[in-house]
Amino acid sequence: MDDSSFMDLMIDTDEYLIDDWESDFPICGETNTNPGSESGSGTGFELLAERPTKQMKTNNNMNSTSSSPSSSSSSGSRTSQVISFGSPDTKTNPVETSLNFSNQVSMDQKVGSKRKDCVNNGGRREPHLLKEHVLAERKRRQKLNERLIALSALLPGLKKTDKATVLEDAIKHLKQLQERVKKLEEERVVTKKMDQSIILVKRSQVYLDDDSSSYSSTCSAASPLSSSSDEVSIFKQTMPMIEARVSDRDLLIRVHCEKNKGCMIKILSSLEKFRLEVVNSFTLPFGNSTLVITILTKMDNKFSRPVEEVVKNIRVALAE
């Protein structure tokens, strides 16, 4: 009795499953005329092909465990689980999904290609701009080479003409010149303090023109005198050498002449002709045959003759 009731229950369950499959998939025995639903029909056939096999497995399990009432209850629960899989509400269209995916991929490819085109176009230069850039760079290099050639021509003892050597030697040469200029400036400051504006009147020469005579003298600036032998020889060649210096109404006269008798008297007599008041005078021997005569005089308010004329008269007096 138990076995017969169990078999009847299995038959009823199988009929219920087949009815549900037919209601869920009415197109199993028909050919589909809608091209858009081919994938849907194929899915239905796959489900029909899979579920009988599962049912056969459950039937085998049921036959093997038909001796116990617990096996019937477990098979019933399995049958209910199989029924719950066939939900008619969850229908998908894989064709539409594949079309949407292919459209999305094509759109992404188009956007990517447009971005690449924009980047490539932005990175490129116009042909005429590129040509102008090349010409400007060429001119710049040409000017740079010309400047380097001119600089290398100014550098003494240049061994190599490459850019690095030229620049290095130029820097060294400039540093040497700066040091030299600094030394010369220091020497100039020192000598400027010692220098004095001195009028040197050399030997007078007489130029005869008809019955009149004129005296010409050469004036130059000189540094303070030294006691070296070279200076002494120069003094002997240019003697008598007369220096005159004016400060306000004072006139300082210094005469370098050979040691002769009556030199001081001749000089003082020539100064009296110009009505110059002698304030102080002294004589110093310089070497064996040279005298240094220094005379300080004061000019009155009526004195208007130039100092050069006084010097010429002193020279003429010493030459007599």
Curated annotation (Swiss-Prot):
Tissue expression summary: Expressed constitutively in roots, leaves, stems, and flowers.
SUPFAM superfamilies in alphabetical order: HLH, helix-loop-helix DNA-binding domain
Name of the gene encoding the protein in the UniProt record: NAI1
Occurrences of domain bHLH (ranges): 128-177
Protein origin, superkingdom: Eukaryota
GO BP annotations, alphabetical order: endoplasmic reticulum organization; regulation of DNA-templated transcription
Organism lineage string: Eukaryota, Viridiplantae, Streptophyta, Embryophyta, Tracheophyta
Keywords assigned: Activator, DNA-binding, Nucleus, Transcription, Transcription regulation
PROSITE patterns: BHLH
Main location: nucleus
Residue span of region Disordered: 53-105
Any Pfam family: HLH
Native source organism of the sequence: Arabidopsis thaliana
Protein name: Transcription factor NAI1
Subunit (UniProt): Homodimer.
Listed SMART domains: HLH
Sequence ranges of Polar residues compositional bias: 81-105
GO CC terms of this entry: nucleus
